[in-house]
From Swiss-Prot:
Part of the 30S ribosomal subunit. Contacts proteins S3 and S10. It comes from Arthrobacter sp. (strain FB24). GO terms for molecular function: rRNA binding; structural constituent of ribosome. Belongs to the universal ribosomal protein uS14 family. This is Small ribosomal subunit protein uS14. HAMAP family: Ribosomal_uS14_1 (MF_00537). Coiled coil: none annotated. One of its GO terms (cellular component) is small ribosomal subunit. One of its GO terms (biological process) is translation. The gene is rpsN. It holds the Pfam family Ribosomal_S14.
Length: 101
């Protein structure tokens, strides 16, 4: 079980990323636009630097939705590999069976 503070911090980051997503996209487009001037690129670069660090989606962590485990998470299911195995053995995941050949 992850610390509740770490789970809460990640949730807060999700909110911040969502809040600044449109502005970040606009500034990123200005940086790579071949028609923009050097001054416009410089202004876009400075604008990106002024955004909060937590506005970057790279700082988000995929966590298990049940207990918040930060590593070994299956994106398709939103749970960790450990929880996935337990739930699959108990038959709680429809369509998932243990392979045998």
């Amino acid at each position: 079980m992850a610390k509740k503070s770490m789970i809460a911090k990640n949730e807060q980051r999700k909110v911040i990323v969502e809040r600044y997503a449109a502005k970040r996209l606009e500034l990123k487009k200005a940086l790579v636009d071949p028609a923009s001037t050097d001054e416009a690129r410089e202004a876009a670069r400075l604008g990106l630097q002024k955004l909060p660090r937590n506005a970057s989606p790279v700082r988000l962590r995929n966590r298990d939705i049940i207990d918040g485990r930060p590593r070994g998470t299956f994106q398709k299911f939103g749970i960790s590999r450990v929880r996935f195995r337990d739930m699959a053995h108990r038959g709680e995941l429809p369509g998932i069976t243990k392979s045998s050949w």
